[in-house]
Amino acid sequence: MFDDALHFVANLLEAPDWERLGVHLPYEWIEQAVTYTGAASIRHRRLPAEQVVWLVVALALYRHKSISEVLDDLELALPDADVRYVSKSAAAQARQRLGAEPVRWLFEKSARAWCEQDRQAYLFKGLQLFAMDGTTLRTHDTPGNREHFGAQNYVGDTVASYPQVRGVTLTMLPTHLVRDAVFGPYGTSEMLYAKELVPNIPDDSLTVFDRGFLSAEILCSLAAGGSNRHFLIMAKSNTKWELTEGSEQDGIVRMRVSPQARKKCPELPEFWEARAVEMVDQANRKRTLLTSLRDRRKFRSADIASLYSQRWSIETSYRELKQTMMGMALTLRSKTVEGVYQEIWGTLTAYNLVRLEIAKAALDAKCKPTDVSFIRAFHIIQFELHWAAVTRSYGKLPSSMKHLRERLVSLLNEQRPGRSCDRAVKARPLRYAVRKVKKLP
């Protein structure tokens, strides 16, 4: 029986088809990425630059596997009659030759194209909805990574055990597709990274910010730099303003720009205005939201409060990246600075691939993309790539994609019921019996 099973696996199952997701990530984009960035392979190699780009994206989908296993399972290397397998060192050298710029170009190209797909289905009164937030990732503790990225400093001159990468992402609220991202050294503040992202925010949009980004320079440049670009942010407890119109629950306020901010950015005015909307959070605490949506008839205060409550769902995007895709790994794979950047752009591209499939499946099922389980979708895509034995004929690709989306929406996320009993903290069970001895007086 075991011999029959081996024969079935070896001879009957087709090789995994990486072109399975080529309907979303066309090969033309891969060629353009390596051509525009000057990373195209001149010599005939088993791992040309185009295949290495696929490899970087695949490594993010299969974080629990080594680079050699991913190469063999997905058959990314070109066939060679003399050498059957590609060594780990050859794959590492191929990644070094590629660099990070082609993968970054591919992410930016694909992210903009995917965010424009079905955008009409997710508009809020004519506006696209985005959210901006920051996160950190650990890297291997190598001299190069520690020198370039730096690490967190604690009290008493204590430094974190691992270097860290700090980044800020611009994510679509309805679909959680990452539209744009900026990453770099840990010592650079999120405010500076956010300033780099603001010019890339599209017109006719509303961006929901974490209150840590409350800055006149960021918010004023967002509203003035494009056409019909708006912001929504929670005010800090020490934010001071003067009410000029309306009521304290919903009115127009005027705030003074600090002299330090005007010194850094002379274009800023002395005062800037926003609409202040009072809301009550889940803990029954009064909060104030600041927004540039000043039309009270078109944008009611209840709508604005509901939009800001959706911002918290973006936190799950980082959890999906770090826990589900990275498998709770302590650090990234790469040990070089260029490799770290390359891996991050590849991971974001892979994450968007999964999120795009979820969005397509949600449209077919007429439900919200956030109602579809990311973990289930991620596991299904992994399984499909390996064992579905999809033919390489593009004629059968649409039926395969339809089958995938039907599986994704078969079990939607359910709202958890409220707590039925009081919360209790229990002692952690010990592996061995412990006898406690009382101290003698």
Predicted feature locations:
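Long amphipathic N-terminal alpha/beta scaffold segment
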Residues: 115-124, 139
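DNA-recognition alpha helix
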Residues: 66-82
